[in-house]
């Protein structure tokens, strides 16, 4: 009788343990399934040119990936040069957009833009070690905004540039990336003074050494501006500005294999945000790298039981 009771007792304990184990596995599985990573695809419009080859490359990419929204970061110099057809320029730019996209501001120190905004043009220092003095044509692309201009002049430039985008039918921008990732305290203050809430100018300079020499102005300046940046950086508050580090750089500097590798590293380290992108002006040459990487990223996320979310803005 006693033995039968003990057997019954042990059996009940075993059943209870099995139930607890099953529930714990279910909770664990649910936890893993809830792991997420959000990927931001950004486009830097450099203000150089609007060549059909690049625009058509982007258009084809959008047809292939209509579910991926893009943050379109535009330098307004396209509209301020002599004899420009503003409406045609706007139409060309919008020809690459989808309704799910968001427009933000990207700034390079073009002389045409500085003159339009009535900010005294500075021709140095250059992150590309170039002579940015010119009497005719346009120049200033590689002038470091942070290092060349005062906070007051930067605030005036940001305000004026935002107004240009609004005048062309875009919403007032609140997203930003500095040309050459040249963001420091002065430009940060200028952005906040003009209502910007989101920036993606922080980057690990080592991600750019495929194109820039260690002794170049670009690498040296970025190692000062973003001294402790790494590819694992995650969003944080920079005063009132929400900083989203460009932790995967742009496709000009990273191969498809590297993009996927960085994505896997972020997953393995349980990071939740990846910011990558490309330049409009070089889309024909480098957008294909994202085209190759995206299916591999989606497959890697699925294999790791991680939900891949393509960032949305609406």
What are these model-predicted stretches?
Residues 29-102, 111, 172-173, 275-276, ...:
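Active-site beta->alpha N-cap acidic-glycine motif
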Residues 31, 198-200, 259-314:
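C-terminal domain-boundary segment and adjacent tail
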Residues 2-14:
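Bacterial N-terminal signal peptides that target proteins for export
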Residues 13-22:
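Bacterial N-terminal signal peptides
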Residues 175-272:
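Active-site-adjacent pocket scaffolds in enzyme catalytic domains
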Residues 62-70, 135-184, 266-277:
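CE4/NodB-like, metal-dependent polysaccharide N-deacetylase domain
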Residues 83-158:
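Substrate-binding cleft of extracellular glycoside hydrolase catalytic domains
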Residues 46-54, 75-89, 111-115, 177-186, ...:
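Acidic-and-aromatic substrate-binding clefts and catalytic sites of carbohydrate-active enzymes
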